[in-house]
Amino acid sequence: MSDILAVAREQVLERGVGLNQDQTLQVLQLPDDRLDDLLALAHEVRMAWCGPDVEVEGIISLKTGGCPEDCHFCSQSGLFASPVRSAWLDVPSLVEAAKQTAKTGATEFCIVAAVRGPDERLLAQVAAGIEAIRNEVDIQIACSLGMLTAEQVERLSEMGVHRYNHNLETARSFFTNVVTTHTWEERWDTLRMVREAGMEVCCGGILGMGETLEQRAEFAANLAELDPHEVPLNFLNPRPGTPFGDLEVLPAAEALKAVAAFRLALPRTMLRFAGGREITLGDLGAKKGILGGINAVIVGNYLTTLGRPAEADLELLDDLQMPIKALNASL
């Protein structure tokens, strides 16, 4: 059998054709002593097909907690013994958060709400926030508001939402182990409508929720079929009181192999470091990830957990001589 890294070099690096599901599994199964070679190849692929720029994004939780869904990893579910809840953010708070995000050099600001899908009150608050931000801050606005109807997709597009995030979370075959209150197909339908409306699609998931390597490879193939503009990669940070609260953190080498494997499966896609990387990888692992296929980061804190200080990520990018992606000139 041909060495999978030699195959990937010819197929992915030279021709820009992502690995298929079986090939991705072979990468995930590589022994740890091949990790450095794997990361180096993934970095070459990233530089060849995405370039040196790194997109920086900040996120804010407009509505925290009280969600009716049972996503087993999430402390914002109202169904678990993990009460995370706070008042809705008002418009001035959204604007101030966008300003602080822009000061880091970020070009993307994502407004997030813990809901199954937005109701009229939430959409009105989002619309008011977007209008105020666009009047005061030079930044692209993304949203993550759960599952949408066709009419809601159209309204968000008309508001000027640049990109919509809705994660598939995991492989289709593993989804019912993670969520039971809605289906994988419902999430897929929202993503399809978002693309049809002309917004960029942002879709990723969480690694380390008990899925097998085969299912991790399946998930990469699911994402390749969707072909999103951006894939955020999260690593499970077990939350007390949730069904996944007692799972072990993914070993760093396994997490880095996954990062590189997803890059080789998705050579032209923006691959973003998201939640959980602090406890899974630490500072050294963050550097290895950025030198192993990652070309986008979330700076600052996440929705319910602390992230690395924005300054630490920005200093790392500067040390690695990786420029922050400039704001789209069309804005």
Curated annotation (Swiss-Prot):
- Pfam families from the xrefs? BATS, Radical_SAM
Annotated residues for binding of [4Fe-4S] cluster: 67, 71, 74
**PROSITE patterns to which the protein is assigned, alphabetical:** RADICAL_SAM (PS51918)
Binding positions ([2Fe-2S] cluster): 110, 143, 202, 272
The protein's annotated catalytic reaction(s) are: (4R,5S)-dethiobiotin + (sulfur carrier)-SH + 2 reduced [2Fe-2S]-[ferredoxin] + 2 S-adenosyl-L-methionine = (sulfur carrier)-H + biotin + 2 5'-deoxyadenosine + 2 L-methionine + 2 oxidized [2Fe-2S]-[ferredoxin]
Query: Which pathway is this protein assigned to?
Result: Cofactor biosynthesis; biotin biosynthesis; biotin from 7,8-diaminononanoate: step 2/2
Q: Which residues form the Radical SAM core domain?
A: 52-277
Keywords carried by this UniProt record: 2Fe-2S, 4Fe-4S, Biotin biosynthesis, Iron, Iron-sulfur, Metal-binding, S-adenosyl-L-methionine, Transferase
Keyword tRNA-binding annotated: no
Q: What is its EC number?
A: 2.8.1.6
On cofactor binding, the record's note says: Binds 1 [4Fe-4S] cluster. The cluster is coordinated with 3 cysteines and an exchangeable S-adenosyl-L-methionine. Binds 1 [2Fe-2S] cluster. The cluster is coordinated with 3 cysteines and 1 arginine.
Q: Name one GO molecular function term.
A: iron ion binding
* GO terms for biological process, alphabetical: biotin biosynthetic process
* Family the entry assigns: Belongs to the radical SAM superfamily. Biotin synthase family.
Briefly, what is this protein's role?
Catalyzes the conversion of dethiobiotin (DTB) to biotin by the insertion of a sulfur atom into dethiobiotin via a radical-based mechanism.
Full protein name: Biotin synthase
Species source reads Mycobacterium sp. (strain KMS)
Gene that encodes it: bioB
